[in-house]
Amino acid sequence: MDNWEEFCFGFTLIKAAGGLVFNHENELLMIFRNGKWDLPKGKLEKEESIEKCAIREVKEECGVDDLHIIKQLTDTYHTYELNDREILKHICWFKMKTAYNGKLVPQIKEGITKVNWVKRCEIAEKLENSYGNIIELLKDE
């Protein structure tokens, strides 16, 4: 057993996908959930491709349509506890573009209270109240 397998042994693995979505004005789609700025993402469903999962989650969490994947980005991992179980979430990220200019609709049942298009010059400010893996993901963008 290698170190990675040893590390993963005590966790329930959840695979998910999400998007760094940019509109025609090169603004980034961000969500506000649990008191932090984040990116739309969610769990992979059975027999769903990871790309379809990423697109579906952006649509569900933000109400954005007409999404096109540009490229796959780096994967991220984070751990948390849920119902006395240790969870390891593996997230596959995709850079996307959209021409959608309709209303943004936060998925309230998922705890999302805001969905915003964020100008490039305002991203750093939002990242002051975000997660380490999101900061790392956006470093090269």
Range-by-range predicted roles:
Residues 129-141:
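Charged phosphate-binding loop/patch that engages nucleotide di/tri-phosphates or the phosphate backbone
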Residues 40:
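Compact nucleic-acid interaction/catalytic patches
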Residues 44-131:
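Unchanged
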Residues 1-18:
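Acidic, metal-coordinating catalytic segment for phosphate/diphosphate chemistry
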Residues 12-17, 32-34, 89-91:
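Short connector loops at helix/strand junctions that flank enzyme active sites
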